[in-house]
């Protein structure tokens, strides 16, 4: 229903316009207060790169963060990552991740980024506190913040927006009548716009999410996902249909697709109940970090990597590395 409202297919979005106007006024006033100097943002002693969205819902932001961290690491840059830690609840903040940190404490995306990149990761509702925790514990040269485009309390040097190339900006309205956190005109002020799927427009960087081999949660064994049979697909991400479409494109045809809420807590019994005798569970890598502790033999995940096209990605990386002292 929300997808139909935000796309404009359902006329119900008109009923929500008063709330959207209120959302837009408040969010605009917050941004203006920082722009005019009525409020002051905290500036880190190292460059800060924000990777965020203009819309609610999954746009492929976390794969972009992982891509950016890995590319900078390949250039010898010491990178730290901060996040709000959605879906997690720690006893105290900021929380600096360790190999033992669970998704229940840190959230699924920070744990995934930490496991994939090995970069220092810290979470806190106040992003500046997370940055300070990393700087106190690690000699990093640059900070990447996973989400937080609208978190103006943290000053930033580079802003990158990730856009779903198929859904774009829906009906163009602020939440809750539409998907927008900020209006599309905000694109004029960011340093780069990366478009996940669909067709990129002039000045935008095209990106595709490229699936790898399926990985068994218990053994680490790898195989072509099309070789798995009797698949039940599970996706607890911002836009589950994208994952299900990826499986179909890989030649894996799920018998059942189970969409879950983004950052949803997964209880062992609930996940186990999805899979019948002789069936194979295939999930996203983000779900896998929550399920690994209680995984069964026939549970697999399909990792995806961001692939950015054209000359612009190299120019963006050169621009970012030029800020590192």
Curated annotation (Swiss-Prot):
UniProt keyword list: ATP-binding, Kinase, Lipid A biosynthesis, Lipid biosynthesis, Lipid metabolism, Nucleotide-binding, Transferase
Enzyme Commission (EC) number: 2.7.1.130
Cite a single GO MF annotation: ATP binding
* EC category name: transferase
InterPro entries of this UniProt entry?
LpxK (IPR003758), P-loop_NTPase (IPR027417)
One BP annotation, GO: lipopolysaccharide core region biosynthetic process
According to UniProt, this protein's pathway is: Glycolipid biosynthesis; lipid IV(A) biosynthesis; lipid IV(A) from (3R)-3-hydroxytetradecanoyl-[acyl-carrier-protein] and UDP-N-acetyl-alpha-D-glucosamine: step 6/6
Record's catalysed reaction(s): a lipid A disaccharide + ATP = a lipid IVA + ADP + H(+)
Out of the domains of life, which is the source? Answer: Bacteria
One Pfam family, please name it: LpxK
Q: Which NCBIfam families match?
A: lpxK
The UniProt family comment states: Belongs to the LpxK family.
* Protein role: Transfers the gamma-phosphate of ATP to the 4'-position of a tetraacyldisaccharide 1-phosphate intermediate (termed DS-1-P) to form tetraacyldisaccharide 1,4'-bis-phosphate (lipid IVA).
The entry's protein name is Tetraacyldisaccharide 4'-kinase
Instruction: Name the species this protein comes from.
Output: Salmonella schwarzengrund (strain CVM19633)
């Amino acid at each position: 229903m929300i997808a139909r409202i935000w796309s404009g297919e359902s006329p119900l979005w008109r009923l929500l316009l008063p709330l959207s106007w209120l959302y837009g006024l408040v969010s605009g006033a917050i941004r203006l207060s920082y722009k005019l100097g009525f409020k002051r943002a905290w500036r880190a002693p190292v460059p800060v790169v924000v990777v965020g969205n203009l819309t609610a819902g999954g746009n492929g932001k976390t794969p972009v963060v992982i891509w950016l961290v890995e590319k900078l690491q390949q250039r010898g840059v010491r990178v730290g990552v901060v996040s709000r830690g959605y879906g997690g609840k720690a006893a105290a903040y900021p929380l600096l991740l360790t190999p033992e940190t669970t998704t229940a404490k840190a959230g699924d995306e920070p744990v995934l980024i930490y496991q994939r990149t090995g970069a220092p990761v810290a979470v806190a509702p106040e992003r500046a506190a997370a940055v300070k925790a990393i700087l106190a514990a690690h000699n990093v040269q640059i900070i990447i913040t996973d989400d937080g485009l609208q978190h103006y309390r943290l000053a930033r040097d580079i802003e990158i927006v990730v856009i779903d190339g198929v859904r774009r900006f829906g009906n163009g309205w602020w939440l809750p009548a539409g998907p927008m956190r900020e209006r599309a005109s905000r694109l004029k002020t960011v340093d780069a716009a990366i478009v996940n799927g669909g067709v990129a427009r002039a000045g935008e960087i095209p990106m595709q999410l490229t699936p790898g081999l399926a990985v068994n949660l218990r053994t680490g064994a790898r195989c072509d996902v099309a070789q798995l049979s009797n698949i039940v697909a599970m996706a607890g991400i911002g836009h589950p249909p994208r994952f299900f479409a990826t499986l179909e494109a890989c030649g894996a045809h799920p018998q059942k697709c189970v969409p879950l809420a983004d950052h949803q807590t997964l209880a062992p019994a609930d996940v186990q109940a999805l899979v019948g005798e002789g069936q194979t569970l295939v999930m996203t890598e983000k779900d896998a970090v929550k399920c690994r502790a209680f995984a069964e033999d026939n549970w697999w995940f399909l990792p995806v990597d961001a692939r950015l096209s054209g000359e612009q990605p190299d120019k963006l990386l050169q621009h970012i590395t030029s800020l590192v002292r």
